[in-house]
């Protein structure tokens, strides 16, 4: 591979970053995968697979491992960031001085900025300026299934139509990976953050033993919360019926591959927050997202009762069953009301 002609540089060598890099390489593209831990990258290079997260998926020959950040960023103008939301801004500030002048940035990170609840587009603009094209991909994607080549579909939104078209062409694979374009940059970002919160609630409900009826009600009312917050931020309501909204929400709330759901199940079964996080062993994005989504909802005056009760469990020590009963005990209302 020429050092400057890769189709994409992927920043973040966890399970999802690796899965996306594999998918791109499988599409016939030269891809560079960078991770912050040189020892981890050396292990990936030696094994030619991510044995920790994706042990049964060998790397295509066109997937190149790189531990030097400057070299990785010089390899392509297209940068795909796949890191936890709480380090998103820090990573962008780290890569900014090393990016090519023609660089374009897309992220697969789902969440909001830690503490402030800002959308990641605002974090990116602050870190990188107003000139660089930005994009986001989001949708129902478990890393293991994506890496295995099982059928998957996502949404793609960008501030730049040329970038959106190029990304759709790079990522889309008719056999296994369908990429839908969507002009709603805000909505595609927001869905991925709120669904993490609702998934914890769905897990809590199942952990308590409330059954399928309760889980489905929680998903449906969670979608209503997502849509209300989206409307307040200027998103298109139709986005939340697509891959980045309902699609991701259903997947994350119903399948035990979801860390957020498993975390919630442990809480519903009586485990404390810290012990549940330690047992998961990886980042539970919904833990921080709950605080951030609640902050955003307060800022825009949007009532989100499910999010509020999950916050009370995670940060105020409320019992999961008590939180569920609080929701069930809410006053009667019209299903279509705005609160």
UniProtKB/Swiss-Prot annotation:
SUPFAM superfamilies: 6-phosphogluconate dehydrogenase C-terminal domain-like, NAD(P)-binding Rossmann-fold domains. The active site is at 195 (proton acceptor). The keyword Transmembrane helix does not apply. It is an enzyme of class 1 (oxidoreductase). GO terms for molecular function: glycerol-3-phosphate dehydrogenase [NAD(P)+] activity; NAD binding. Sn-glycerol 3-phosphate binds at residues 110, 139, 141, 195, 248, 258-260. Pathway: Membrane lipid metabolism; glycerophospholipid metabolism. It is found in: Cytoplasm. The keyword NAD applies. Keywords: Cytoplasm, Lipid biosynthesis, Lipid metabolism, NAD, NADP, Nucleotide-binding, Oxidoreductase, Phospholipid biosynthesis, Phospholipid metabolism. It comes from the Bacteria. NADPH binds at residues 15-16, 36, 110, 143, 259, 283, 285. Its EC number is 1.1.1.94. It catalyses: sn-glycerol 3-phosphate + NAD(+) = dihydroxyacetone phosphate + NADH + H(+); sn-glycerol 3-phosphate + NADP(+) = dihydroxyacetone phosphate + NADPH + H(+). Its main location: cytoplasm. One of its GO terms (cellular component) is cytosol. GO terms for biological process: carbohydrate metabolic process; glycerol-3-phosphate biosynthetic process; glycerol-3-phosphate catabolic process; glycerophospholipid biosynthetic process. Catalyzes the reduction of the glycolytic intermediate dihydroxyacetone phosphate (DHAP) to sn-glycerol 3-phosphate (G3P), the key precursor for phospholipid synthesis. Belongs to the NAD-dependent glycerol-3-phosphate dehydrogenase family. This is Glycerol-3-phosphate dehydrogenase [NAD(P)+]. It comes from Escherichia coli (strain ATCC 8739 / DSM 1576 / NBRC 3972 / NCIMB 8545 / WDCM 00012 / Crooks). The gene is gpsA.
């Amino acid at each position: 591979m020429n050092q400057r002609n890769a189709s994409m540089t992927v920043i973040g060598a966890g399970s999802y970053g690796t899965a996306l890099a594999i998918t791109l390489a499988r599409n016939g593209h030269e891809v560079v995968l960078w991770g912050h831990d040189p020892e981890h990258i050396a292990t990936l290079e030696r094994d030619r697979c991510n044995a920790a997260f994706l042990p049964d998926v060998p790397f295509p020959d066109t997937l190149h491992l790189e531990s030097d950040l400057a070299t990785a960023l010089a390899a392509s103008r297209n940068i795909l960031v796949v890191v936890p939301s709480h380090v998103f801004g820090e990573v962008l500030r780290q890569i900014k001085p090393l990016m090519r002048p023609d660089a374009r940035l897309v992220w697969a990170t789902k969440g909001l900025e830690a503490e402030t609840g800002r959308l990641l587009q605002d974090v990116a603009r602050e870190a990188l300026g107003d000139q660089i094209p930005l994009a986001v991909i989001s949708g129902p994607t478990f890393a293991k299934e994506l890496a295995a080549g099982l059928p998957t579909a996502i949404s793609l939104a960008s501030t730049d139509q040329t970038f959106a078209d190029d990304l759709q062409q790079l990522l889309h694979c008719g056999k296994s990976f369908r990429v839908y374009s969507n002009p709603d940059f805000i909505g595609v970002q927001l869905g991925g953050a709120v669904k993490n919160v609702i998934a914890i609630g769905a897990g809590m409900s199942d952990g308590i033993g409330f059954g399928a009826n309760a889980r489905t009600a929680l998903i449906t009312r969670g979608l209503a919360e997502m849509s209300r917050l989206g409307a307040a931020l200027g998103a298109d309501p139709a986005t939340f019926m697509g891959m980045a909204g309902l699609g991701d929400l259903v997947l994350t709330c119903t399948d035990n591959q979801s860390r957020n759901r498993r975390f919630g199940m442990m809480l519903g079964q009586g485990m404390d927050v810290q012990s549940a996080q330690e047992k998961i062993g990886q980042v539970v994005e919904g833990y921080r997202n709950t605080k951030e989504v609640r902050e955003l909802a307060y800022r825009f005056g949007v009532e989100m009762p499910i999010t509020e009760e999950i916050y009370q469990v995670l940060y105020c020590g409320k019992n999961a069953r008590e939180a569920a009963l609080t929701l069930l005990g809410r006053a009667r209302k019209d299903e279509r009301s705005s609160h």
